[in-house]
């Protein structure tokens, strides 16, 4: 039986308190874990090794089931290609489709911001659901569902379809709230949604609403956690070039990510720290 455990970036060791007591363990799309019980590890984030000393352990031990490729568009695609090469694994058709979409969504290789926020296709609808308001139990079920069903079939499940419908119905409300909350610092736009507990992260909607934005910083929270995201608007109308490694910048505050996008997770009671962190992020993004 597979038991998914959702990991959260935080100060210190995020694996502390996570029981590694199963017959086998795998960590995917998350920071490196040097515990010898973690037999499988796949990641594609340049900030995977925190603290940096963990990179030395990875290079020295380099277990044959530890895999790292910061150039991979998505971890899902990286895993599929690695297993195909090393173990001759052939994914079923429905997973090939899921991996193709994972590469596109994770790397944001959409031609326009409008395409990025569309909710027309099953993969786009599932992506919106995964990004907004699903519970840890939903995520665990999603992993199980996707092991034997297509994205279209998962999107129509009774546990998922009503939540996707709610996202669609509330899209106009979210757009109005995001537009009203936008605060500009040069060409960096900030969306502080901390006062609306449970509010959705703007994600690509911010880029769609404000095509002249160069970077976007957003803050959202639930009762238990706070999430800060930082991203470069690859569809920006601005002519300046990105000079900030966003993932490395977020890593300085306990988070991580890629060169163009990153995130930071704090406890739900760290609101003051969250707003101070956003101010520091903006200062870094506007001085370049």
Residue ranges of model-derived segments:
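Glycine-rich, Lys/Arg-enriched anion-binding loops that position phosphate/diphosphate groups
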Residues: 107-200
